Amino acid sequence: MSDYKFTLNLPETEFPMRGNLANREPEMLERWTKDGLYQQIRDSRIGRTPFILHDGPPYANGSIHIGHSVNKILKDIIVKSKTMSGFDAPYVPGWDCHGLPIELKVEQKVGKPGQKITAAEFREECRKYAAEQVNGQREDFIRLGVLGDWQNPYLTMDFSTEANIVRSLSKVIESGHLHKGVKPVHWCTDCGSALAEAEVEYEDKTSPAIDVAFVAADSKAVAAKFGVSDYSHPVSMVIWTTTPWTLPANRALSLSPELDYSLVEFEKDGVTQALILAEVLVESCLTRYNVESHTVLGTTKGAALELVCFNHPFLDFDVPAILGDHVTTDAGTGIVHTAPGHGQDDFVVGQKYGLEVANPVGDNGVYKPDTKYFAGQHVFKANDNVVALLREKGALLNHVAYRHSYPHCWRHKTPIIFRATPQWFISMDNHGLRTQALKEIEQTQWIPDWGQSRIEKMVENRPDWCISRQRTWGVPITLFVNRETEELHPDSVSLMERVANRIEQQGIQAWWDLDAAELLGDEADQYRKVTDTLDVWYDSGSTFSSVVAARPEFHGHGVDLYLEGSDQHRGWFMSSLMISTAMNGKAPYKQVLTHGFTVDGKGRKMSKSIGNVIAPQTVTNKLGADILRLWVAATDYSGEMTVSDEILNRSADAYRRIRNTARFLLANLNGFDPAKDLVAVEDMVALDRWVVRRAAALQQEIIEAYDQYNFHIVTQKLMQFCSVELGSFYLDIIKDRQYTAKQEGHARRSCQSALFHIAEAMVRWIAPVLSFTADEVWQLLPGERDAYVFTQEWYQGLKSVTLATDLSDDYWQQLLAVRNEVNKVIEQARRDKRIGGSLEAEVTLFADATLTEQLTHIGDELRFVLLTSEAKVLPLADATTEAVETELASLKLVVASSTAEKCERCWHHREEVGTIEAHPTLCTRCVTNIEGDGEVRQFA
């Protein structure tokens, strides 16, 4: 036989080298949908322990962005890995469908409700718009390879969910946590509605900063508090504020009880007067007022000035000095202008003193008609007029432009105000909600752990939750209030259940269509229907009850995990915690995981104006979803997640390494039937047994990393295994045995068995991350199997067997280190053109006694490990002058070009080539593999 190529076991597979993911993935998605893959997974886990990841609903408005992709991919990785661990892990995606952004979009199309269109018609348009947005986002999420119940997602606008939201509110009421009050809330004058804490963003703004004097009603009496008797000049208390427009609502001056205050006298423009200022701020204040010299007449504690009265600077009444813990000396005068209708601290301290909660400002930010001086003016435009009036009254001591951080509406990006309005609140303290919530935070696992202290601080400091909104498209607060007493109907809880039953059939419009007499009968005239809607954060925050507790696939099991971006500590995590604790006395989750925001390669937020936005649709169309998924998994999500074209291209390079490894495995399993060809691990060649043992240990590490949500560690370990243990060592060594050994011989079948075990394990390792590629690999693996890898559990065939005669893992690591040193010297010889390929080389290893014993243990098989035609081991002391030192102190090397003939079939240079009459171009080993029983390998 002259052409020996046909006697080789050449690799062959249908698995292409190039993934062509952008084109192949959509085809696979079609098959997944056609085969009902998600339901197959569900069926495979019937009766197993549930693991419930509850999807925080994205808002049904606009296209998905890279942050959405990160979130959904992380969730998908967890659900798939938990399924692989044997859990029943359903994934029901959801959408947040009510609220202002949708209203604004619909207004642009059909106008405001009550103008060209009725409120009922407007709600129907909102429902249609939200449904369209859901459909668009759903397709994009599916394209990412995220498996879930996409045909039956939960929508907060589902009639059943709307009804359950109402039911959850009834439980909050039943527990005594709801109250109505006039309180200052974040108010957007553009929205015409209250805002939740989560709807407020802080941006820099320039405001007028003014110092204002409030003259004492009885200056002599006030001076006496400082130990000054018979004082004849005017005494004033000075406040500093950046919101002059709130001065019409001023009802007090707040001081710190333990702070020292000074009475400071000076003369300016021929007038002698005395000011009360915090002692530590006297110098900075008087510098602002251009006072060159002064006298401190006396000092006293703030507590001594309690209830002393001062004239309002332009209104005809006096205001008291009161004491509050919120007063600091960080800026200003140490005395705080207090308007209970326009500030949370002001409101709280005002309640202690029974102050009027004055609110002269309407919904649109314009002063009401009965506001003296400023009626009909918008508050921000009125600032200059307030300053002018103060100057006219002689009360203005200083006025400058001041740049500071100020709350803005997250939708309109415009400054908001604090404004007292009648609203519905969930009380933080009336029935111990704050205390219980803090206890529940301690019982929850926060990932990363800094999430715990973050949400604790928020709960400790948050005000009562204003849950009412004055909007059209939202779940109604289905309450009846007594027209005279403003009290809730005594049967509110049972009435809400009857309303919920109607909403379940007809949607939220059922509330607005309801005639009160249908439920209240003769009492109807005594009560009015509440027209407010719920804060959308209540909608999403109650889904642990309105969705999870209601859908059968969750089996009534509590939620194990919430996973969202780090902004949700004050958003969904907070609202869910508040509602669940109010309803059930416990948190709705056992674990809360947060991921960072996506930034570009320079650490900047994604912005259309900067032009650094990376759209997930662009990535999937160009590189494929698996590349995006690999980037997400490989990135440490605990901080900001950096993404750019360059970074994604690096992910594509890493992907190619994994794909090439998978291709090598599949190609070399050609013709292998595990049912009859599988060699038991204990009967394998030692190197094969080692790699199976190594894979078994790695699998435990990978499963542990998945369980701890450390996906970047999963990818690191996977890449290390593919690149080092496999790529640079095992796969390189076994090529010779795989290609040249007898096809049915033990040496080759042992190797194929190891490759089979690795492939079976690896396809499962990558399935949660590289879902499309895993499916592609799964379809080409030999042996009978289920239709999809996603219904499987972690591979159980990786037996970690160590025989008494086996070489230790440390031995193989040492051999790997030796091989690396040999490769370096061979590479230099190639560069020097002393040899071509490594099989042209004969290597002499000069080693110390310990290393010599290790190297000679595997005898002639050492050459197969080193990929050389000959390998001799001699004592280190015998090293010749030409021997090259290595990074191993125990090893020196000499590489020479072999003088033996090259075997035509295996390319090894062997002395016997040319001596075998029947096969003059072959070595003895190849003849044995062609005509005999096949070579015997013990070690490698």
Curated annotation (Swiss-Prot):
The reactions it catalyses are:
tRNA(Ile) + L-isoleucine + ATP = L-isoleucyl-tRNA(Ile) + AMP + diphosphate
Q: Where does ATP bind?
A: 608
The molecular function terms of the Gene Ontology recorded here are:
aminoacyl-tRNA deacylase activity; ATP binding; isoleucine-tRNA ligase activity; tRNA binding; zinc ion binding
**'KMSKS' region: where is this motif?**
605-609
Q: How is the cofactor bound?
A: Binds 1 zinc ion per subunit.
- Report the top EC class in one word: ligase
Chain positions of motif 'HIGH' region: 58-68
Main location, first listed in the record:
cytoplasm
ATP-binding among the record's keywords? yes
The cofactor required is: Zn(2+)
Q: Localized where?
A: Cytoplasm
Signal peptide boundaries: none
InterPro entries, from UniProt?
aa-tRNA-synth_I_CS, aa-tRNA-synth_Ia, Anticodon_Ile_BEm, Ile-tRNA-ligase, Ile-tRNA-ligase_type1, Ile-tRNA_ligase, M/V/L/I-tRNA-synth_anticd-bd, Rossmann-like_a/b/a_fold
Functional summary from the UniProt entry: Catalyzes the attachment of isoleucine to tRNA(Ile). As IleRS can inadvertently accommodate and process structurally similar amino acids such as valine, to avoid such errors it has two additional distinct tRNA(Ile)-dependent editing activities. One activity is designated as 'pretransfer' editing and involves the hydrolysis of activated Val-AMP. The other activity is designated 'posttransfer' editing and involves deacylation of mischarged Val-tRNA(Ile).
* Domain characteristics, as noted in the entry: IleRS has two distinct active sites: one for aminoacylation and one for editing. The misactivated valine is translocated from the active site to the editing site, which sterically excludes the correctly activated isoleucine. The single editing site contains two valyl binding pockets, one specific for each substrate (Val-AMP or Val-tRNA(Ile)).
Protein name as annotated: Isoleucine--tRNA ligase
